[in-house]
Amino acid sequence: MSEVDVVILAAGKGSRMKDDLSKPLHKVAGLPMLEWICRAVRKFNPKNIIAVQGADEDFSSYVDETVVQKEQLGSADALRCAFPKIDAEKLIVINADMPLMTENDLVDLVEKGEGFDAALLTADLKKPFGYGRVIPVGERNVVEQIVEERDATADQKKLHLVNAGVYLFRADYIKRAINNVTTDNSQSEYYLTDALPGAKIVQVADWHDILGVNTQQQLAAVSKIARKRINDQIMANGVTMIDPLTTYIDANVLVGTGTIIKPGTVIEHDSVIGAENEIGPYAHLREKTVTGIDVHIGNFVETKNAKIGDHTHIGHLTYVGDAEVGQAVNIGAGTIFVNYDGKNKHMTKVGDRAFIGSNSKLVAPVEIASEAITAAGSTITDNVDQHAMGIARQRQTNKSDFWQRMPHEDFATEYDAKHDQRDDQP
């Protein structure tokens, strides 16, 4: 494959999202859309990834180079802004709001575009509204014209072959051809599609890959597709999901073979789940949760930045945050790892085979040694040594005849009287 630069068009204002976050930074399955694009293109080792951004944006942490489009004058003008950074023989141009685009789509574009000055990805859509229509030259697989939705005639709107917004160009060709692009359209903008007559048409295998995001509803739709793809891949690797439709796993999560994931589970980015785990139902494994082999994380358990050793059981109603938990530990229901002092987060360490009693509160920084115990209901603020039991609660006192002092006595008397009357009825 020839050297290729990638230009990501990311300068659009994204006003239809109706929020203050830059559109390319909206997340799909835990990753910004811009990162999805970068992950796809990096797989074929481009020479440079260049983002064209607005004056108020900074995408430098995602790409190799950035350039600013000072005015929104159209896609051709955006690409022109990137010309000083282009050094390779060919370039791929792609919009920043296409998180479902795959490496295979881009490789197919490069391979089938060989020998052409330009090529573009297309899809055959049953409902093409909103997309530019691709008009081919007769039966040939090359472009005669691309017409944007707002500029199309009634007959052109009936066409189903649409422009995906992903292009391959010979650099020398597009640097010449872009000078012939005019603003003779309804938007008075420089359309990059006007430089595509004669371009090779390359159709994607899965039309979902070309879906773009302009609204919150579209963001939700592509997120649903992305999560299904993630779940399908995880299940293909030997993981059981009781209900994939209610299992939400981010893109950069690893799950080991033989693990069972129950409904309502959420597993967030940078987490690694070991083999033979049982997760859920209704478990929330937040970022940087790492589990060993044969770990059980049950219903209504939340973890974050936690390393959990082999054979450990965290059954229910527990928060484990900023923690290192050893092997074969039992953490009872209602346990809270108290990790935040109002300013800083602190670590809790629990050694192998420790037993944490129900409703314990471990106030970090604190360490529970191997084979140590905390008594149920304790608030542990000091380290507990090996083989010791930490108890931090007041001894129980029973006060006799206390019921009669409470208002419950009158209520109970009235309740009993009413039920006695019902029992007397035939």
UniProtKB/Swiss-Prot annotation:
Main location: cytoplasm
SUPFAM superfamilies for the chain: Nucleotide-diphospho-sugar transferases, Trimeric LpxA-like enzymes
Gene Ontology cellular-component terms listed: cytoplasm; membrane
Residue sites binding Mg(2+) per the record: D97, N214
Pathway: Nucleotide-sugar biosynthesis; UDP-N-acetyl-alpha-D-glucosamine biosynthesis; N-acetyl-alpha-D-glucosamine 1-phosphate from alpha-D-glucosamine 6-phosphate (route II): step 2/2; Nucleotide-sugar biosynthesis; UDP-N-acetyl-alpha-D-glucosamine biosynthesis; UDP-N-acetyl-alpha-D-glucosamine from N-acetyl-alpha-D-glucosamine 1-phosphate: step 1/1; Bacterial outer membrane biogenesis; LPS lipid A biosynthesis
Localisation per UniProt entry: Cytoplasm
Pfam entry (one): Hexapep_2
Catalyzed reactions: alpha-D-glucosamine 1-phosphate + acetyl-CoA = N-acetyl-alpha-D-glucosamine 1-phosphate + CoA + H(+); N-acetyl-alpha-D-glucosamine 1-phosphate + UTP + H(+) = UDP-N-acetyl-alpha-D-glucosamine + diphosphate
Chain intervals for the UniProt region annotation (Linker): 217-237
Cofactor(s) for this UniProt protein: Mg(2+)
Cofactor note: Binds 1 Mg(2+) ion per subunit.
Keyword Transferase (UniProt): yes
Region called N-acetyltransferase, residue ranges: 238-426
Binding site for acetyl-CoA: A333, N339, Y340, S358, A376, R393
Region (Pyrophosphorylase) residue spans: 1-216
Subunit structure: Homotrimer.
Identification of the protein by name: Bifunctional protein GlmU
Organism (species): Oenococcus oeni (strain ATCC BAA-331 / PSU-1)
